[in-house]
Amino acid sequence: MAAMMMRQKVAGAIAGERRSAVAPKMGRAATAPVVVASANASAFKGAAVTARVKASTRAARVQSRRTAVLTQAKIGDSLAEFLVEATPDPKLRHVMMSMAEATRTIAHKVRTASCAGTACVNSFGDEQLAVDMVADKLLFEALKYSHVCKLACSEEVPEPVDMGGEGFCVAFDPLDGSSSSDTNFAVGTIFGVWPGDKLTNITGREQVAAGMGIYGPRTVFCIALKDAPGCHEFLLMDDGKWMHVKETTHIGEGKMFAPGNLRATFDNPAYERLINFYLGEKYTLRYTGGIVPDLFQIIVKEKGVFTNLTSPTTKAKLRILFEVAPLALLIEKAGGASSCDGKAVSALDIPILVCDQRTQICYGSIGEVRRFEEYMYGTSPRFSEKVVA
């Protein structure tokens, strides 16, 4: 019964997309072909010139449509309208609508489902909560009935599962921070979408889209598409629809920090010096312990830095496939930067060889990531300006 309901919801969401989404608005006035010919020109030459002008006109129209697609997404659009304006790929629109539908259902389950443990752990050793498993099932079902997903895997089911569709592969963390759900902290879903038929031997740079659902006082669906500018926030309205409420294209400088794994400062001197810098410069501490709300605040506030570092006695916990790479696409499309894997490189450029590949990470404004790399590695070759501590 649950599977049938999810199939109906996904089908309804896609049908709603077709009904409500309109083609990008643009001038459609026909341009008459111009024939340039002198009195001595032959009919053949006139026809050739006409053909060239027609071809030029068609090319201009195609370019105009492409430009319009990238510029017409606007605040107040529904998610379906935004996707039509942001990407010409109907399969990508379908997979994003399917993830949005699952996010909407998960929001209800987070408010009502059990927070008790299931007395089992996933293959990574993390305790699985009942609400984790509900979210995981909903996302797998949504992807299966989208018919555009080839493979999917999650933090709870890390081995890729054949979804029976074609077009994309999706990796997701169904409910990051779920251990805090009983305290009523914000929790969230993270996902990345890759083209093709594999989820290893890839990089985050190959993602065509990424997103996160944030379940707090408001339910928000935050997404970025590889070929469209900006990072976009959609608010779940009372009527069950997603409304475009914010576009972020720049993350500036501001004294706000979210330092994860502070225990690493005990035996990571460089991290200790960086934290002392933040404290000495009177940065505002804004850390919830959940990477989804902590990253989302950087996008919404358009400033700040998030760090989660390792040390000889505190190992990496964040997984590139399920968390780090999707969040890196969101942050970088919003105008920020990331630094990953103990190297001064973007998290989008780290090869993902296995599903359980883990890393340390920094996200934030370009200036803050540059400072992070200077403190941790002594240099930041990707960025031209040096940090003055």
Swiss-Prot record:
Factors inducing expression: Light activation through pH changes, Mg(2+) levels and also by light-modulated reduction of essential disulfide groups via the ferredoxin-thioredoxin f system.
Gene3D superfamilies xrefs: 3.40.190.80, Fructose-1,6-Bisphosphatase, subunit A, domain 1 (3.30.540.10)
Name of the molecule in the record: Sedoheptulose-1,7-bisphosphatase, chloroplastic
Top-level class of the enzyme under EC nomenclature: hydrolase
The protein's assembly and partners: Homodimer.
Transmembrane segments: none
InterPro entries, sorted: FBPase_C_dom (IPR044015), FBPase_class-1 (IPR000146), FBPase_N (IPR033391), Fructose_bisphosphatase_AS (IPR020548), SBPase (IPR023079)
Residues annotated for Mg(2+) 2 binding in this entry: E155, D173, L175
EC nos: 3.1.3.37
Binding, Mg(2+) 1: D126, E155
Annotated GO MF terms: metal ion binding; sedoheptulose-bisphosphatase activity
Binding-site list for Mg(2+) 3: D173, D176, E323
Subcellular locations according to the entry: Plastid, Chloroplast
GO terms under biological process: reductive pentose-phosphate cycle
Enzymatic reactions: D-sedoheptulose 1,7-bisphosphate + H2O = D-sedoheptulose 7-phosphate + phosphate
Residues reported to bind substrate: D176, G177, S178, S179, Y287, K317
Disulfides per UniProt: C115-C120
Annotated Pfam families: FBPase, FBPase_C
GO cellular component term of the entry, any: chloroplast
Gene name of the encoded protein: CSBP
